[in-house]
Structures are given as C-alpha cells and as structure tokens.
C-alpha cells in the first residue's frame, strides 16, 4: 500500500474534472481546443449514468457519437428507446452530432450493427467505449445459471462482440482506440458478484490481448474501473445508519467524474497509452497493478504434496492476499 499512499497525496496543480455543459469548463475547452474533433465514437450503454456522461463529453470534445442503449432495466429486462434518444437530443441541443442505436451488445449480429451504424452515419469509426452492463447479484451458491450467463453475455461477450466488429476497420486504417469498463469487483473482489467479477476480470484479459495483438497497427486498448453512483449500484440497501452514510458518500462520486479519462484515452494525446488499467474515484486517478509474481520457492529435487505442506506453503504464506473487498483497499474518503 506504500505506493498507493503516495498516490493519495499527489495533487496536480490546476487539474480539475469538469461536468460537461458547465460554463467555465466550456470556456476553458474553447481555449484549449477539442481533443476529439472529427472523430467518430461508439459508446455502449450510453443512455444513462456513466455512459451518458461519456457520450456528452465526447460530443463536447468534437466527436460524432453513436449513443447505443437498448433501454433495459438494471437487471437486463425490458427495453425503451427513450434513454438513447434523450441523450442524442441533449447532444444536439449543445451543438454536437449524435445518432441513437438500440441494438443489444449481448449477441454478435446486433453488436456488429452498432459498428455499422457508425460507418453508415459518419463514414468512419475511431473509438469504441464498451460500457454497457447489467447486474444480477446473488450469493454464489444461490446464483442461477441464467443470472451468471446473462451478466457474462452483456459485459464480457458484449465487449468482445463490439470490439471484434470494429477490429478489422481499425486494422485497415491502422488507428483506433478501445476503452473497456472493468471493476474492482473483478480486480479486488466483492460479495455476491461472481458473475459480474468474472466478467469484469475477463474484460481485463480481453483488453490486454487486444493491446498486444493490435499494437503493431497503432490500435490501443485500455480499461477503466469506475467509482461512481449510478443506477447499477442504486440498489445498495440503506436499512442502517452505516449503510445510509456509505450511500451518501458514494452519491458524491457522480458519473461525470469518469468521463474525462475516457475521452482522453480516445484522443490522439493517448497515442502511447495501451494495455493499462485505470481507476477513477472522484478527483483521483489510479494506475492499477497487473498480475506479476510476488515470491518464488524452489527445491532441487522437486516437490511432493508433503514437502509443499511442510516447506513450500509456510514460505509463501506471509505474502498471501487477504480476502479483501474493494472497500477494504480503498478505505479512505474520496478526494
């Protein structure tokens, strides 16, 4: 935790996170130029929450945006055109360009139509934000097969389907940026989210593989792990005073805080950033670790189950990870 503690105290002079549409940041943006001018961007799950804020900021930064959202409930049920249409309307009111798309990411052919929508509407595609998601939490032994599979389909398979449909375009034009959403539920762990955690950690592997495979074609792939209040965590219980206090703190972490790093990763200023995992919590940005060996042991004559028990495990146990959750690791108030 030493490096994390140092990161907590690092303040960048003059840095800020700006909510799209506010007067002063808008003036600053005009002075600085637009980081996504002329680009075509897909944002999945863009009808509400984090996806909405990403779509709004990308448009404010000059991108033409495909606002994808089938308008399902937090558990994936139902559908509505309104969320995507309302975001498109808001973008147009602010002088931007956007089209709505209502396809699901959970199946290959509909997902490919999201990419087709960008080409048909804007003639090109420069970036993909895989943000779409649902939640169906349950303690593992009570989790249904359907609950597990449906979350995997939207988060992991959805990220694959949309990325795969865009990959050949990016290969041909030798440029492009993928931004995938992971979670500390996968990176660290959480109760009752085996489906969500498996999907989100799978997305990290997907992103790294894309980064390795496509770096030679100048195509980038990164992950963002958000801390933000959205409808997907709006079902947190508030039965006790402690739970109410926790929710009050989380509600301060608005989804607009996540959008700036996503817009950055989509832009040319991030041309040398790929294969990384970033977390955002209020005004903090973290570069997250990736799996590497911690300790090693060796025995010239090899190991048996007995010698592992007697010598191997005792030597390694001091470096074991605890069964931590995200709240155990990020245990200070958001800045």
Model region roles, listed by residue range:
Residues 163, 199, 207:
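Active-site helix of classical SDR
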Residues 102-116, 145:
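The beta1-alpha1 cofactor-binding region of Rossmann-like NAD(H)/NADP(H)-dependent oxidoreductases
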């Amino acid at each position: 935790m030493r490096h994390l503690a140092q990161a907590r105290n690092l303040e960048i002079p003059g840095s800020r996170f700006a909510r799209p549409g506010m007067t002063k940041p808008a003036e600053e943006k005009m002075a600085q130029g637009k980081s996504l001018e002329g680009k075509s961007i897909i944002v999945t799950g863009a009808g509400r929450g984090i996806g909405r804020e990403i779509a709004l900021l990308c448009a404010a930064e000059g991108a033409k945006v495909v606002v994808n959202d089938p308008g399902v409930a937090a558990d994936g049920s139902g559908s509505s055109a309104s969320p995507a249409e309302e975001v498109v309307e808001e973008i147009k009111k602010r002088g931007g360009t956007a089209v709505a798309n209502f396809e699901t990411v959970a199946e290959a052919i509909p997902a490919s139509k999201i990419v087709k929508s960008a080409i048909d509407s804007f003639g090109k595609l420069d970036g993909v934000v895989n943000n779409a998601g649902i939640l169906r939490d349950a303690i593992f032994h009570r989790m249904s097969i359907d609950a597990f599979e449906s979350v995997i389909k939207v988060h992991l398979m959805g990220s694959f389907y949309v990325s795969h449909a865009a990959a050949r375009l990016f290969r041909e034009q030798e440029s492009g940026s993928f931004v995938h959403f992971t979670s500390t539920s996968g990176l660290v762990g959480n109760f009752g989210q085996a489906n969500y955690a498996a999907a989100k950690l799978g997305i990290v592997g997907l992103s790294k593989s894309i980064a390795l495979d496509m770096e030679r074609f100048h195509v980038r792939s990164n992950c963002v792990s958000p801390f933000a209040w959205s409808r997907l965590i709006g079902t947190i219980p508030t039965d006790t005073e402690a739970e109410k206090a926790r929710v009050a703190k989380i509600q301060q972490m608005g989804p607009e805080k996540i959008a700036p790093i996503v817009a950055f990763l989509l832009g040319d200023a991030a041309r040398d950033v790929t294969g990384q995992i970033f977390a955002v919590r209020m005004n903090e940005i973290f570069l997250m670790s990736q799996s590497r060996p911690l300790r090693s042991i060796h025995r010239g004559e090899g190991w048996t189950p007995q010698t592992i028990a007697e010598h191997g495990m005792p030597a390694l146990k001091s470096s074991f990870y605890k069964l931590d959750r995200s709240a155990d690791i990020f245990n200070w108030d958001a800045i």
